[in-house]
From Swiss-Prot:
Antimicrobial peptide active against fungi, Gram-positive and Gram-negative bacteria. Inhibits growth of hyphae in the fungi A.niger (IC(50)=3.5 ug/ml), B.sorokiniana (IC(50)=1.8 ug/ml), F.oxysporum (IC(50)=5.3 ug/ml), F.graminearum (IC(50)=6.9 ug/ml), F.culmorum (IC(50)=6.9 ug/ml) and B.cinerea (IC(50)=13.7 ug/ml). Has no effect on spore germination. Destroys spores in germinated conidia by disruption of cell walls and membranes in A.niger and B.sorokiniana. Causes vacuolization of germinated macro- and microconidia in F.oxysporum, F.graminearum and F.culmorum. Keywords: Antibiotic, Antimicrobial, Disulfide bond, Fungicide, Plant defense, Secreted. The keyword Cell division does not apply. GO terms for cellular component: extracellular region. GO terms for biological process: defense response to fungus; defense response to Gram-negative bacterium; defense response to Gram-positive bacterium; killing of cells of another organism. It comes from the Eukaryota. This is Defensin D2. Disulfide bonds join C3-C50, C14-C35, C20-C44, C24-C46. It comes from Nigella sativa. Pfam families: Gamma-thionin. The lineage of its organism: Eukaryota, Viridiplantae, Streptophyta, Embryophyta, Tracheophyta.
Length: 50
């Protein structure tokens, strides 16, 4: 099971899930990452093991 947390290093709207994933894994120690719609825009969300 994964817990999601907004990226702490991504700024602005997320338009590239691949780049978001790489940044979550490389910079934040997450297992995965993707662009998800969170009001008011697409955000980079990182996924961690709960």
């Amino acid at each position: 099971k994964f817990c999601e947390k907004p990226s702490g290093t991504w700024s602005g709207v997320c338009g590239n899930s691949g780049a978001c994933k790489d940044q979550c894994i490389r910079l934040e120690g997450a297992k995965h990452g993707s662009c998800n719609y969170k009001l008011p825009a697409h955000r980079c969300i990182c996924y961690y093991e709960c």
